[in-house]
């Protein structure tokens, strides 16, 4: 079909205001990841895709079979009224012509079937940003303007970014990515999503990198640590200090009012709610499916063979045979409790502590044997998180969102009320007569100690 025809179809009913944004925000969508190539033009030092290569690429015929399978399979259709297609690699923009064909094909197919996903479809790109500035990319965004979102991998300052996100010949990629970022920002006013990643070798750049990302215009910075076994004995202390220095900067500059970073999320490090203990953290296999270049089906992208040192992938079906529900069944029981040891199950700062069933499977040979490389780093994050919210209370005189969240997110989920008698110097009113000329006031130290007691009991 000609470009004019696809544009005409998309313009008839496909607009962002027709999509149930509330439903998307609550995570109510089927996430289908399509690995269009295992090739990448970068060699990032911390990348978990250890088996990238330049010969495994998806064909359009395979892509069409994947789309046909998703659209016609009852299991996929019943999972959600919303569909997210995530194009990934390698570097997906290396196969932009293929992605363009795939996007047109699924839109036309959904339209012809009057499918519920036609007005509830989003395309997502997980890209390193170096190949964005191209004619085909420009044409694609004009055509699929209303349902395509980009996530740029920008790690922070040029020094930090160029240390870890390098080209095949060892050069930094910061300048190329920033050029792409500014072009996208100039062309479109949409919010741009970013992701930054930190490992042992670059922790010392964390504070300056988060500030740099804020300066670029990212008000809510998404940043995380790698899950792999890379951490050294001194890293938790470095991480904690970097975050505390960042917290100090936020209050001294006033940016705590306008900007945020994931490390200071209000729930991070709270005791686990009872309902969290029996939930799957990521939804692999029942909220997400991933397809490799040959059309094999996996619970998520991290189960692909190229993501494992020993090529131990976990295939749960194919486009020819469909989903193997017996293979998926093993994932149904992967909850916090079932994959964790006694230490994790009794942890009092467990909320937001990352775990990955694919990593369990690849490193320990079982979905139910939790990898814990991140443990001490998470605890360091929690200490810094408490520091941030404590300073928030000192600066504002208000009860922090973290304290409120702890009550709401507690295991018992019931509100408790505590009264602080901060002074006995009450004025006379009605039938009450003032009994003291000089009042007794609760000291700040006593107030802080009492509040800590309440939080811990």
Regions from the PLM with identified roles:
Residues 26-61, 410-447:
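Canonical Radical SAM [4Fe-4S] cluster-binding loop centered on the CxxxCxxC motif
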Residues 1-33, 76-78, 391-421, 438, ...:
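N-terminal [4Fe-4S]-dependent radical SAM core
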Residues 241-271, 302-354:
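C-terminal accessory region of radical SAM enzymes
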Residues 67, 71-88, 95-226, 444-457:
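Radical SAM/AdoMet-radical enzyme domain recognition
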Residues 282-286:
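Short, small/polar residue-rich loop motifs at catalytic or cofactor-binding pockets
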Residues 39-49, 299-302, 341-359, 377, ...:
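Local cysteine-cluster metal-coordination motifs and their immediate loop/turn environment
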Residues 207-277:
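Long, K/E/R/D-enriched contiguous segments that form extended
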Residues 69-88, 372-407, 453-457:
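Short Fe-S-cluster ligation motifs
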